[in-house]
Structures are given as structure tokens and as C-alpha cells.
């Protein structure tokens, strides 16, 4: 830039300056929101009795108590059964399944997790046939129970979060219909909302009984509930 050009150039115009300020403000707000959200999450974890209990009793997550409560109410786990856990990280549901006497337990998750003795764990995608084949190779036959504690990353917008989680449940239901043994059971997390009705209707076509369970271990104010379906039929 020449000296004449420098003298003539007055810097960015007011519109560009305003746009830049707004962009910076949005970034600061977003960063602060993430920071506040993280602080709330940490505080909630520190105050959560189930988090402390899980640590004391050797479970990998507080979610283990949800499955224990669900099983106490619905009797979906039994000795000698074959279990598939979709979205299994960090492994609490696998631990409970083995503890309750399951003979074979396999799990799959996009996230890596440490091995659990007695279980086959695949780092992969339930939508990838090769990953599913590797997981199912860990079973000697068709599964008796399919579990899914999958949930989409939350956005803070209830309806969006609900629809995204319902999409995961629909994927889990499709997996169950394809792989579950006759008479088998299915348990999955859903968020309360209107779209859940379609999932329930689909389950009622393929299972003798379908019901909702809200474990006490679910956090107060959480919209999550669990759908439990028993008596699979094609």
C-alpha cells in the first residue's frame, strides 16, 4: 500500500466494524455459556449421590443404577442370556448385565472405552454393517436382550433434543427387529415428547408388552424415560 493509499484508507467502515463487534460478542457469549454449563455440570456431579455411589461400588457410571432399577421393575435380565448394548460407553450397563448373570455381552460405541472382562466391546458405528458384524461375532447366537442408553448431544432446545434422541431410538428399534431372538426384550432411553408415540406404536407391533419406566436414578427434571418391550415377535 502506497503512502497516498494509506492516507486515503480510513479503516473498515461502520457497518464492518459493527459486524465485527457483533461476531466477537457472539463468540464471547457462546464461550461464557459453555463455561457456565460446564460449571453447572461439575457442581451437579459433585452433589449427585449416584455419582458417589457408583465410584464407591465400582460402576463406571451412575447409569448402572438406572438399569438396576429397570430390571427390578421389569425383570429383563436373567442368567445365561445374550445381551447387546448399543452406545455402551462408559460401560455401566455392561457391568450390570454381567453382574446379573448374562452369559454373553457385546457392546458398541463410537467412543473408545477400557475393556470389561467377560464382554466384547467394539469401537464402531451401529450403522456400519462391518462394525455390527464384528460385534455380533462375540455372540454364540441371536441376542435375548438389546439395550440402548444412547442419547444425542443436547442443544438446550427441548424439541430438537427430543427429535434427535427419538431418531437414535428408531435406529435401535430397527436393529432389534432385525437381530432379536423370538421372545426377547428391548430397553431404550427416550425423551418425553410427541414423537415418542411413533416409536411406541412400532414397538407394539412387534412386542407383546410395552411400557415406560422412570428410574429414580434419572436426574430430577430430566425428560428422559425408558421404554421396555418384552415378548418379541416378528
Curated annotation (Swiss-Prot):
Active site residues per record: 189
EC number: 2.1.1.166
Molecular function via GO: rRNA (uridine-2'-O-)-methyltransferase activity
Subcellular location, principal: cytoplasm
Pfam families listed in its UniProt record: FtsJ (PF01728)
Family affiliation: Belongs to the class I-like SAM-binding methyltransferase superfamily. RNA methyltransferase RlmE family.
Protein name stated in the entry: Ribosomal RNA large subunit methyltransferase E
Organism of origin: Hyphomonas neptunium (strain ATCC 15444)
